[in-house]
Amino acid sequence: MKRIIIIGATSGIGLEVARCYLKDGWQVGVAGRREEELEKIRLSAPGQVCTQTIDVTREDAPFSLEQLITKMGGMDVFLLSSGIGKQNLSLCPDIELQTAATNVSGFIRMVNAAYHYFEQRGKGHIAVISSIAGTKGLGSAPAYSATKRFQNTYLDALDQLAHMNCRY
């Protein structure tokens, strides 16, 4: 059975992607911050879903990913769907910094952990939900736009490391 881990699967695009993979018969690892939502997903497909509470802004997030990989007996596909974005016309520093903490620092933590896992295995797939905002800034959400541009450029750079059998 193929195995996918989705970070940020408790709502939105991540949750819908998890549902699609479950319908296709995959074993799905779902992770996010909200334990009650993770439990709902697990109960919707017992035996097919593994869960792990992960906050990508925490330094121990890669360790939590390792725990989920172990629970699942491995990982074939990694999807990062966690991210935040708020309109911030007043440029409140707290909003900008929180956005960067999740969409840059958390992104690096999780993508690098998945990259190293697949590098050791010699194969695997990494996917990230980014945004069209990464191609042209949104004046109402400067940090969001900048962090999505960062993600796109980072993934382009990782693609240059394609000497291993890992796709992005």
Task: Specify the residue positions occupied by each region the protein language model found.
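Residue(s) in the substrate-gating loop at a strand-loop-helix junction
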Residues: 131
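Conserved NAD(P)H cofactor-binding loop of Rossmann-fold oxidoreductase domains
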Residues: 81-87
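Active-site helix of classical SDR
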Residues: 111, 147
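Conserved glycine-rich cofactor-binding loop
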Residues: 10-11
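Active-site loop immediately N-terminal to the catalytic Tyr-X3-Lys motif
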Residues: 136-142
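Rossmann-fold cofactor-recognition segment
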Residues: 45-60
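Short alpha-helical oligomerization interface
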Residues: 88-101
